């Protein structure tokens, strides 16, 4: 009789252990998936916040450039048909926009290579503008901002670059100026990225933005702005998975998670250590294992006594 009790108890307990193990595995899977989806949603929302910041920054500066263009083109052609006329009639407008728009510089590049500019230098000299040109071996027509706008006949936005005077990242927005169908010059504004950087720095999470040459120009972690940092693992993972799709990659032997999306010519990304998901999962797994052991122990004891009672 005792032999039968033991055999039945073993069979019953084996079934119970198997069932509890299956339930624990299923529970672990759903916990992991829930944490994954929750993290993906949070990271995507933070990425959207960065995306909106970049879009607003771009829209604001394009609007400013278009408004400046309209104000200049209100002048008759006779006020714009020579370098001297532009200096005399437009110089005050360039200075006003630089100050009111908090811009690094505002200028018009002419087809003779001269650049009529309102900047900190003109401010120091107490004049509306200064002229960059042959006198200091400068040729506006060879510059990217000039050629890009002149050749495309639309607003041209340069990749981010470090300004030589402020040592800060900035971007140039430029546009060809025409009056009565005649080319006047290329209008440009230099915009510091400090305001965008400050806005992104306040965004929770590890967010950053690449320009169209895959160079980071704004980031929550300012260490990422260092040009020597290799960002190819993130970029390669993004290219393989596409916009707004979660991906994993290795960085310095550490597993990381991320998501990126295109914002015009830029790429906004957010990345985190895989521990953001793995730690809660391992914690949940540990708790489930302990609970499973306790439940199995209780079920073994209960089933043994139940089997013993009904076979006695």
PLM ranges: what are they?
Residues 99, 118-191, 196-199, 248:
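Extracytoplasmic/periplasmic ligand-binding sensor regions of membrane-associated signaling proteins
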Residues 84-100, 182, 186-224:
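Solvent-exposed, extracytoplasmic
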Residues 9-10, 27-57, 78-85, 277, ...:
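Juxtamembrane interface helices immediately C-terminal to a transmembrane segment
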Residues 41-49, 57-154:
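Extracytoplasmic/periplasmic sensory segments of membrane signal-transduction proteins
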Residues 110, 178-179, 210-211:
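Short, acidic, Ser/Thr-enriched surface-loop or helix-capping motifs
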Residues 1-41, 289-301:
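Extreme N-terminal signal-anchor transmembrane helix of membrane signaling/transducer proteins, especially
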């Amino acid at each position: 009789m005792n032999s039968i009790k033991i055999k039945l108890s073993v069979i019953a307990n084996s079934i119970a252990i198997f069932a509890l193990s299956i339930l624990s595995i299923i529970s672990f899977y759903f916990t992991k998936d829930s944490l994954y989806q929750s993290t993906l949603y949070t990271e995507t929302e933070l990425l959207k916040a960065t995306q909106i910041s970049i879009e607003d920054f771009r829209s604001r500066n394009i609007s400013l450039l278009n408004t400046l263009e309209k104000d200049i083109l209100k002048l008759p052609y006779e006020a714009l048909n020579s370098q001297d006329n532009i200096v005399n009639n437009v110089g005050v407008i360039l200075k006003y926009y630089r100050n009111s728009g908090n811009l690094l510089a505002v200028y018009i590049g002419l087809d003779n290579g001269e650049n009529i500019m309102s900047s900190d230098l003109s401010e120091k000299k107490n004049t509306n503008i200064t002229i960059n040109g042959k006198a200091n071996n400068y040729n506006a027509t060879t510059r990217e901002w000039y050629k890009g706008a002149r050749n495309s006949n639309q607003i041209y936005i340069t990749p981010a670059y470090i300004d030589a005077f402020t040592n800060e990242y900035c971007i140039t927005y430029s546009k060809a100026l025409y009056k009565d169908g005649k080319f006047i010059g290329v209008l440009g504004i230099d915009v510091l990225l400090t305001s965008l950087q400050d806005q992104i720095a306040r965004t929770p999470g590890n967010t950053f933005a690449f320009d169209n040459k895959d160079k980071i120009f704004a980031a929550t972690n300012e260490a990422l702005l260092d040009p020597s940092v290799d960002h190819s693992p993130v970029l390669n993972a993004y290219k393989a998975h596409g916009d707004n799709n979660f991906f994993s990659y290795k960085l310095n032997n550490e597993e990381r998670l991320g998501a990126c999306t295109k914002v015009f010519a830029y790429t906004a990304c957010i990345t985190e250590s895989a521990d953001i998901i793995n730690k809660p999962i391992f914690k949940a797994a540990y708790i489930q294992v302990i609970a499973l052991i306790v439940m199995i122990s209780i079920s073994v004891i209960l089933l043994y006594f139940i089997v013993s009672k009904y076979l006695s």
